[in-house]
Amino acid sequence: TVQPVDATTWYNDVYVGRQFDATITGLDAKNITARAMLERFVSDNGKNFVNYNNPAYDELYAKARACTDDAEQTAVYQQMETMLTETAANLYLQDMADLVAVRSDLTGYTFYPIYAQDLSTVGYSE
């Protein structure tokens, strides 16, 4: 049974308390580094709210942290992403659109990399 809950309940029971069988939530990882996103799946990471536990993944993460070569670190990150995909750590249902089209006579628009847009500063040029 899917039980809708408010954001505070979700944060306390799921994110902090880890009291769930499955959860559906919106996550936006556009503004964090690859390392910050991938470290969320390390077994003992406090932000690992999906309770992913994989010693092989943890070893790859430690290896990536120890890398001094960008190309080598990128290759390890790719291995980690492959492992997350193959073990179904998460199931992504949507990829937020990040395209915006505006008329040439509109001014003041600022693009935000999230679904909400502030149109209070938009106006017509004269």
Regions found by a protein language model. Name each.
Residues V14-Q19, E39-A66, D95-E126:
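Short, solvent-exposed loop/beta-turn-alpha elements that line the ligand-binding surface or hinge
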